[in-house]
């Protein structure tokens, strides 16, 4: 775990309620499937912020949009995790909800059913340049690219960050939603982003290449630094069209892979803010990812 980062990390992204259903083996269509079900706070943006705070970043801020139904609960949970939340309460939409179906077999693989609710209604009117006061890194959840208002928000935030010289990182977030958005459109929307943190599937989808190393290299011609998260196969770092490092994964016994990529991203950014090089930051990301898969839900353990 890292300590002593200077300056704040501002994360902008989704804050949702996760309903995690852990079942063993295939679902039984038309009848009952036994499961262990829990309701926990989630959202890719919120998870990244919590893991960054857990990994030693002393000033983590989160901007997100929620419904009045769960705003107070989410704010309490974020504060308890060491995050400074700025939650916009939507007067019409409910807080986003995600049903996470987790197969408790060896891979602990998960499938998401997503009702974005208020999360993707963040718009340019929710942005203020003052949000960057004291901020040395802006991180955007890729889910923001999957609705019109939040796409406009991303353009406004990136323009503001570039004007201030604040680096911007982005996690594509969802291979399924990327297919709907379109590769060319996504690449145009991330113009101006400094660090891209795709999963292996997302990197291959964005380039049309089957090999993740080739995909990372190609993406790094569009974005200065690409960090491809590969789960049990670690991470790849590429820039200027070349893969420069392969960081191995930490051993883990998976219970639930929900939020593993968010844990990687949070720890990676927290470490990067200490002045560490990207390879060391990726090693810390792999450590956090290993911790995450051994827990249920996408958040780190609570503070003592």
Outline where the language-model segments fall:
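Active-site metal-binding loops of divalent metal-dependent hydrolases
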Residues: 14-15, 143, 263
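Glycine-rich phosphate/adenosyl-contacting loop at the front of the ribokinase-like
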Residues: 1-61, 70-73, 253-254
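Structural alpha-helical scaffold elements that stabilize or flank donor/cofactor-binding regions
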Residues: 130-131, 188-189, 219
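Alpha-helix C-terminal capping/helix-to-coil transition sites in glycosyltransferase folds
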Residues: 133-134, 191-192, 222
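Conserved beta-alpha-beta core of the PfkB/ribokinase-like small-molecule kinase fold
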Residues: 137-214, 233-235
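Conserved N-terminal subdomain of the carbohydrate kinase-like
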Residues: 29-34, 54-140
